Amino acid sequence: MQKLTLTLTACLLSLNAFSATDTTEKPVQHLIVENMGSFLEAKTVFIEMTSDLNAKEVLDKNELHEIHMITYSLEKSLAFYAENLSGTAQKLAEDIAVVVEEIHLASENNRQESTREFLSNYFELSQDFIASIESSDLNKH
């Protein structure tokens, strides 16, 4: 009877450990990045970091770490846009920021397939966003 109780307790504890969802994950601040100071700076960072992400193919442990570090700069760039744009462009920046946070968490926790899926979503959204910031006069400020 004591073995049964111990076994059931162990099972319940292990289920509890596995029941945590991704929505409860909180990122760990590993890197402090300065806020963006201009549209030109935010644009440059966004385009360069997107290019760096696009170069990642293997998504091994090293690349996942690099992706994780890239997300810090992307988060700052998107925060600048979310604060300084309006309308559709602002909404798109906010939507992309949510995906970047998902990439951040997945790469930080070495989840290769989740990271790949979130990156795919990111690249779809970022194409429209890059086109909008490239064609706007915002980058001249």
Residue ranges of predicted features:
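Sec-dependent signal peptide recognition
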Residues: 2-10
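N-terminal signal peptide c-region/cleavage motif recognized by signal peptidases
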Residues: 14-17
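Surface-exposed patches in mature extracellular/periplasmic domains of secreted proteins
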Residues: 63-64, 84-86, 115-118
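Immediate post-signal-peptide N-terminus of mature secreted/exported proteins
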Residues: 20-65, 137-141
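Generic structural concept
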Residues: 36, 40-43, 47-50, 68-71, ...
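Short, solvent-exposed, charged loop/turn and helix-capping segments
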Residues: 71-92, 137-140
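Short helix-adjacent coil turns
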Residues: 62, 103-114
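A charged, solvent-exposed segment within the mature domains of Sec-exported extracytoplasmic proteins
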Residues: 112-141
